[in-house]
């Protein structure tokens, strides 16, 4: 008698649950970007009297009426995907400034926290590493070591903390005060001086200090994502390189940033 042998199913190239969540998050931000960018464009043209203001407002209102309900539906679906995830339940859901869409992006792009043995590797993946004293940037002909979409997501996290954060907004304010007292990045930059001459001046630009503060806070936040997720999963956790090797004294523990009573965004 001939025996039928059933071949094992082929190994998937990706975790379908993770990729499903990622596609939902990307769809949400793609639609939001279309709405915001188009509205900004028509309003800008109206301000330059290229387009009638009434028409610009009609277009903006139409976009909002059409796309905001779709964004809301996607947000609801994303919430269903993330609500049972360990790092959402244990950490992300308790942070002001992090809603289901940002959390969904973080969870889906990281996938398995076990593949990041150190927080430095996670920082680099999100474009937060410091290379030769500077943040890593795209260079023609060179391989990048970060995910450009993750870098954008990290930027969105920072903007959200500034707008609606609490504990991390407080940390941002502290960093602003620190960098102002320090004189910005501590370096001098070429600026225009008297009579149009180029001179070296200390870094005190508000925009630069703002970006430095956001970057510092976002790095601490992703350190907290890494630590909390690994602790919850029972994986080993090490101190960041600046603490362990460079002797930096300030360490922010993730549990100190849990905010009880937070309303889901």
Language model features by range: what are they?
Residues 16, 20-23, 55, 59, ...:
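Non-transmembrane, amphipathic alpha-helical segments
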Residues 34-44, 48, 80, 160-163, ...:
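Intrinsically disordered or highly flexible coil/loop and linker segments, enriched in small
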Residues 92, 106-211, 215, 225-228:
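Phosphate-backbone recognition surface of nucleic-acid-processing proteins
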Residues 205-242, 246-257:
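Basic, amphipathic alpha-helical segments enriched in Lys/Arg and hydrophobic/aromatic residues
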Residues 32-35, 39, 71, 104, ...:
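A structural signal for well-ordered alpha-helices, especially hydrophobic packing surfaces
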Residues 1-47:
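Phosphate- and other anionic-substrate recognition elements at nucleic-acid/protein interfaces
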Residues 42-101:
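Helix-hairpin-helix/helix-loop-helix acidic hairpins
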Residues 257-265:
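Acidic, Ser/Thr-rich low-complexity intrinsically disordered segments
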